[in-house]
Regions:
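Terminal, non-globular segments
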Residues: 2-187
């Protein structure tokens, strides 16, 4: 077994872990809070996108079309997550973040249509994924700040989950920022 076989095998861990999370979340779905239900929906959406992207990539040779879809689904899930967590208490903040969400969604829709018209590596840009990931990190940081400044107690599990969200999406951001330069180094 060489390095290629090992890395190819490791790519199958993602749907396996997502499937496990969906099954586990489904077993406890009626007993969990709305925030954790959103996470289960998120895992299900990511599993559907993962499987669809693999099948589409095998059939058409490129699954770049799914990058903006992935970014939109992540942004939608975590916007809902933080909406229900209570960080949008003020009307100003709700309007501001709602406007950013709508503008980002419009950009992702535009990027989706431009990629679907020309899904080649040479013209690929991962801006929608970078934008959605950056906004999720900002929402998570805003969650920390608003909970620290408020006098309300926060459940330790929610605090831990928010920390994991920040760490995961910060790593994704670090990975996706240079992708444009790696793919399009001649531009």
């Amino acid at each position: 077994m060489d390095f290629y076989d090992i890395t190819n095998f490791l790519t199958y861990l993602s749907p396996i872990i997502l499937f496990g999370g969906v099954v586990l979340g489904s077993c406890y779905f009626s007993k969990i809070d709305i925030l954790y239900k959103i996470i289960v929906y998120y895992l299900f959406g990511m599993l559907a996108i993962d499987i669809s992207a693999r099948v589409y990539g095998e059939i058409y040779g490129s699954n770049l079309l799914f990058i903006p879809i992935l970014g939109f689904m992540e942004l939608l899930a975590f916007f809902c997550f933080y909406f229900y967590s209570g960080i949008l208490e003020s009307r100003k903040k709700s309007v501001f973040l709602g406007t950013i969400f709508l503008l980002s969604s419009a950009f992702m829709a535009w990027e989706f249509t431009s990629i679907s018209n020309n899904a080649t590596l040479e013209g690929f840009q991962s801006y929608s994924k970078v934008i959605s990931t950056f906004l999720i990190v900002m929402l998570a940081i805003d969650f920390f700040i608003s909970k620290i400044l408020s006098s309300k107690n926060i459940a330790p599990q929610l605090f831990f989950l928010n920390s994991v969200i920040i760490m995961y999406f910060s790593m994704v951001l670090i990975i996706f920022i240079p992708i444009d330069f790696l793919i399009n180094d001649a531009t």
